[in-house]
């Protein structure tokens, strides 16, 4: 139960709140207006960059991962004997955990709004879910105890961390840079995630031939690449630059499975409780409705053995750049 509370957004840190008339005032028009200025809806960077497995049919998903490689031998001449070898698999388990939120709102506010308030709320719920998922997977923020260590902690244990020095190019592209750390584990970097502050550091960064290594798509101007690999700047508030400035790696090794896709349910009866157990809202008595959103998913880093790095304690498909002291 404690495990579930960590990811259950309707277990409020403070007393329960609702969308009141003041909060929805911009949606209740005084004069005619047919547009609502929306901010950019930030989706989960982890789910968009990671590899989705088949949906889970139960709370746990068991995944076989190669743990021992076979060895071949030369046969010495015509009379030499052929030797045997072995191959083994380990099992990694993805455990689905629930993320949820409840949004109460008075019926009078819904009646007086010219716009569909629920249509405006739902994208923000998706953004909140994305922030919660990204924070837990990348940095372990409020992660359930059944989930594995986050990417930054995993990379730290494997020694795949680089402290930013005076030369940013060397810290990223050098022989002991972030990209080299991933390659030393037998993986190729196919993506980067970074704090928004890294954009200013990367502008104008050039390779030894004078060519920029940080580029944007000339057609859209929004898709960025670093050394040819796509780069994300999560803007949902999940990226903790105090722990990492940039995370690079083979994101095909970040896998996730969904037990229950995001579902919405509208309630007209029931109660919403505060943290101390007292009743904050009685939906029927207060003429309110509540939208509940629920999603269940889990993730894992398979990290199978490869020929370049047999020691799994030192093998990691991710590395990160952290700020210098």
Question: What feature does the model see in each segment?
Answer:
Residues 2-27, 52, 71, 76, ...:
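Protruding loop/beta-arch "assembly-hinge" segments enriched in small, turn-prone residues
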Residues 14-101:
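Assembly/oligomerization interface modules of large self-assembling protein complexes
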Residues 28-32, 58, 116, 120-124, ...:
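Generic recognition of stable, solvent-exposed alpha-helical segments in well-folded globular domains
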Residues 29, 65, 71-75, 112-113, ...:
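Short helix/loop capping segments that flank catalytic or ligand/cofactor-binding pockets
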Residues 57, 153-289, 295, 325:
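Extended oligomerization regions of viral-like shell subunits
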Residues 67-72, 100, 109, 131, ...:
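Short loop/turn segments at secondary-structure transitions that flank enzyme active sites
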Residues 74-76, 115-116, 203-207, 241-246, ...:
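Short conserved micro-motifs at the rims of enzyme active sites and ligand-binding pockets
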Residues 90-93, 98-184, 319-325:
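Alpha-helical scaffold segments that mediate packing/assembly in large oligomeric complexes
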């Amino acid at each position: 139960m404690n495990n579930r509370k960590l990811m259950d957004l309707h277990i409020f840190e403070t007393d329960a709140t609702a969308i009141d008339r003041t909060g929805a005032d911009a949606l209740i028009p005084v004069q005619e207006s047919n547009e609502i200025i929306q901010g950019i809806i930030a989706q989960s960077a982890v789910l968009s960059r990671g590899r989705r497995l088949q949906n889970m049919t139960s709370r746990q998903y068991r995944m076989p991962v190669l743990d021992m490689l076979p060895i071949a031998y030369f046969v010495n001449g015509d009379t030499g004997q052929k030797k045997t070898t072995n191959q083994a698999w380990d099992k990694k388990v993805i455990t689905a955990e629930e993320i949820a939120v409840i949004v109460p709102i008075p019926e009078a506010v819904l009646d007086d709004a010219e716009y569909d308030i629920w249509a405006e709320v739902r994208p923000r719920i998706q953004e909140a879910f994305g922030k919660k998922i990204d924070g837990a997977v990348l940095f372990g923020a409020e992660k359930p105890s059944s989930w594995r260590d986050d990417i930054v902690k995993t990379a730290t244990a494997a020694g795949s961390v680089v402290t930013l020095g005076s030369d940013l190019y060397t810290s990223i592209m050098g022989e002991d840079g972030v990209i080299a750390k991933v390659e030393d584990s037998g993986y190729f970097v196919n993506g980067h995630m970074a704090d928004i502050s890294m954009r200013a550091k990367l502008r104008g960064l050039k390779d030894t031939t004078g060519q920029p290594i940080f580029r944007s798509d000339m057609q859209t101007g929004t898709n960025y690449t670093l050394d040819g690999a796509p780069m994300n700047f999560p803007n949902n508030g999940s990226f903790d630059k105090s722990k990492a400035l940039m995370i690079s790696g083979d994101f095909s090794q970040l896998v996730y499975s969904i037990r229950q896709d995001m579902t919405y349910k509208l309630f007209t009866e029931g109660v919403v409780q505060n943290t101390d157990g007292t009743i904050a809202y009685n939906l029927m008595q207060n003429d309110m409705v509540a939208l509940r959103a629920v999603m269940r998913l889990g993730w894992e880093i398979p990290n199978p053995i490869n020929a370049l790095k047999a020691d799994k304690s030192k093998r990691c498909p991710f590395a990160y750049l952290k700020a210098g002291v």
